[in-house]
Every structure is written in C-alpha cells, then in structure tokens.
Amino acid sequence: MRAIYDKMAPYYDRIIGVVERLLFADGRQWACTQATGRVLEVAIGTGRNLPWYPRDVELVGVDVSPNMLDAAQLLAEQLAWPVDLSVGDAQQLDFPDASFDTVVATLTLCSIPDERLAVQEMARVLRPGGRLILLDHVASPIRPVRAVQRLLDPLLVRFEGDHLLREPDAAVHDQGLVIDELSHFKWGIVARLAAHKPPQPVRTDASARGFV
C-alpha cells in the first residue's frame, strides 16, 4: 500500500477531486465538523480534510505514505496549523489505549488490507465516550449495484488496492461501539457512519453466546 500511495501522491488530489464531486459531496465537511478534543485522523493522506476541522481541536494525523504526508505537511503550514503528522499503519496504531476523543477516517477503510483490524485499533485508541466518524464507499445493499461491484472489485484490489465490498458498520458493531448514525447515498455506495465508545463495553452477539 505504501508504494501505491507514494507513487500516487503527486496527482492524488486531482483524481480524488473528481470522485468526490461525483460521490461524496459535503462528506468531508460532515465528518470533520463533528470532531472535538484530541482528534486522530487515520490515513490523513494529503490533508484534504484539514480545512474542515474546528480550530480548537488538537489534531494528530497518520498515514502509511511519507509522500502523502509531505503534501499534508505543506497544506498544514499554508493553513498555519500545527498538526502532528507521522507515518503509521492503521492496522497497528502507535498510540496508547484510550488516547483520543475523536477518530476520523474518510475514504480509508476501502484501501486498508484488513479493515476489521483497523477498526479494532480505532476503537482501542478511543476514550470512553469518544466518537468514531467514518466516510467511505462500501458494498451497496442494492443487488444490481452490488453485482457490478463484485465484478470490478478484483481488478481494483489488484491494481489500486481499493476494495469495493467493505461493510464498516459490521466491523464497528463487532468492536462494541454504538452506532449513532448510518446513512447511505448514491445507490448505497457511499456510507456515513458516526459511533461512540460507551463507558462500559457493549456485549456483541458473539460475546453474549460465550464465544469470546
């Protein structure tokens, strides 16, 4: 993944800008304006979310690609915002448990090899009462659309590392987080999800049956 995004970094904003206009509309604004306190953005990329965060948050950003982070650092300097940026893997976050009030991930889980492990890590670093905000393209619940996604998925995974059939709500639920908002747009392809970490762990179906 690092090699793909390092190579993509110089023209990433041009490509993703077209996709965003077609699919995601004001999704970044929706995600970032909900952030409070100490905030971790996972896969911050070139920093496209930076203009949308409230200026009173303490923002930390990680990304697997150093080249993408270079672009994010340049934008942060242009915005005169001291963002703490570092190279990091979403599947193994280098932060203590319960160290963030908000975790934000936009167009992220679609490109991570193990999205469930990434969500597990996001839940781990959230403080009790903290919020997880996700924006991504996902497996559509509409059968004809999903059939097309199934056809395209192997090609996109192979050449771009981009997965079309992810279901982040299931991964979030399995980590004991409480989903407060789940909305689908654009034929079910785009999902906006907001969840919180309860003060006490929520028993999932598996744990209730004594399997974990």
Which residues are covered by each model-predicted region?
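N-terminal, positively charged/glycine-rich alpha-helical extensions of SAM-dependent methyltransferases
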Residues: 1-11
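C-terminal alpha-helical "lid/dimerization" subdomain adjacent to the S-adenosyl-L-methionine
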Residues: 15-18, 133-192
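Conserved alpha-helix/loop element of class I SAM-dependent methyltransferases that forms part
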Residues: 18-38, 48, 52
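Class I SAM-dependent methyltransferase SAM/SAH-binding core
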Residues: 38-92
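Short beta->alpha hinge that forms the Motif I/post-I loop of the SAM-binding pocket
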Residues: 64-66, 114, 137
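A short acidic, Gly/Pro-enriched loop at the edge of an enzyme's catalytic core
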Residues: 91-103
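A short SAM/SAH-binding and catalytic strip from SAM-dependent methyltransferases
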Residues: 102-114
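A short glycine-rich, Lys/Arg-flanked "PGG" loop and its adjoining helix->strand segment in the class I
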Residues: 116-128
